[in-house]
């Protein structure tokens, strides 16, 4: 069980960080959505998703590594916008066994059972993944927000960066200038809710799809209590889901974690080798 929990923590963090996806859906150009112009619709999507400076929730994390069956663990998800994303894993009696912390500086993963940790900067991750990774993209995925590569919060002035098209499942917003990567967001009309985010790398079979469901009121807006992540195209498919409860925007918690000097620092490459053997 201990090894299984460790694999879950490392895999979820790495899947989030190395997220890439492609889309092959049939799209149709539109000019009006539910009585709104395309510009008004995109503005509404941005407005509906923004405005949350913090998020805390109890979390049931389910991970299926390579189709071997899902393993579930309980924990807590905490976010302070622009500062940190924390995932604490506490499967037994509320005792934390692992923690993942993502900040603008990089990623910290602490394995409390084996008293070890990994700390890696986004610069290192970019070199390793050969991709333009950044904190704001990961933050937007967890907060159910639209995003543009290399940019923080979106405003109505960013509407022109998106191409609006319809498909059978909803209204798709494609980023016009994606360079090597393509960015697509599937929204639901007339509510203008973000239902799926996708980041694609052309010419590859890899696919990461981040879906949102079970929307609930948080503050004055809707937020998904269910997030499903699937990573496809590799030899072993990986699926993860986050079932959230007790949602709040509480900020009364420690933003950054201090690592005990009794913990051993290990390299990311060592963790990758362990995962690839599974």
Enumerate the language-model features and the residues they cover.
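Transmembrane beta-strands of outer-membrane beta-barrel pores
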Residues: 63-65, 91-93, 231
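C-terminal low-complexity, charged extensions that often adopt amphipathic alpha-helices
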Residues: 128-160, 278
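Gly/Pro-enriched, hydrophobic low-complexity segments
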Residues: 154-266
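N-terminal leader/targeting segments and the immediate start of mature chains
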Residues: 21-71, 270-278
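C-terminal motif of bacterial Sec signal peptides marking the signal peptidase cleavage site
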Residues: 16-20
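Bacterial N-terminal signal peptides that target proteins for export
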Residues: 1-10
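One face of beta-strands
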Residues: 53-61, 73-77, 83-89, 98-100, ...
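An acidic-aromatic
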Residues: 84-140
């Amino acid at each position: 069980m201990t090894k299984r929990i460790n694999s879950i923590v490392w895999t979820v963090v790495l899947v989030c960080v190395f997220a890439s996806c492609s889309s092959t859906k049939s799209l149709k150009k539109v000019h009006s959505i539910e009585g709104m112009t395309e510009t008004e619709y995109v503005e509404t999507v941005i407005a509906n998703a923004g405005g949350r400076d913090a998020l805390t929730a109890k979390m049931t994390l389910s991970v299926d590594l390579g189709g071997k069956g899902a393993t579930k663990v309980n924990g807590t998800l905490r976010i302070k916008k622009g500062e940190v994303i924390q995932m604490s894993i506490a499967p037994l009696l509320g005792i934390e066994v692992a923690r993942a912390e993502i900040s603008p500086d990089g990623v910290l993963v602490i394995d409390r059972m084996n008293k070890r940790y990994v700390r890696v900067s986004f610069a290192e991750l970019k070199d390793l993944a050969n991709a333009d990774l950044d904190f704001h993209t990961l933050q937007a995925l967890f907060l159910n927000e639209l995003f543009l590569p290399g940019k923080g919060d979106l405003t109505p002035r960013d509407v022109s960066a998106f191409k609006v098209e319809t498909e059978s499942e909803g209204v798709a917003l494609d980023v016009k200038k994606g360079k090597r990567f393509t960015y697509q967001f599937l929204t639901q009309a007339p509510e203008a809710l973000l239902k799926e985010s996708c980041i694609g790398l052309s010419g590859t079979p890899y696919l990461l799809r981040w879906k949102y469901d079970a929307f609930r009121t948080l503050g004055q807006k809707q937020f998904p209590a269910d997030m499903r992540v699937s990573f496809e195209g590799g030899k072993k498919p990986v699926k993860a889901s986050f079932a959230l409860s007790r949602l709040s925007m509480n900020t009364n918690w420690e933003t950054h974690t201090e690592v005990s000097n009794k913990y051993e620092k290990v390299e990311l490459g060592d963790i990758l080798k362990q995962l690839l053997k599974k």
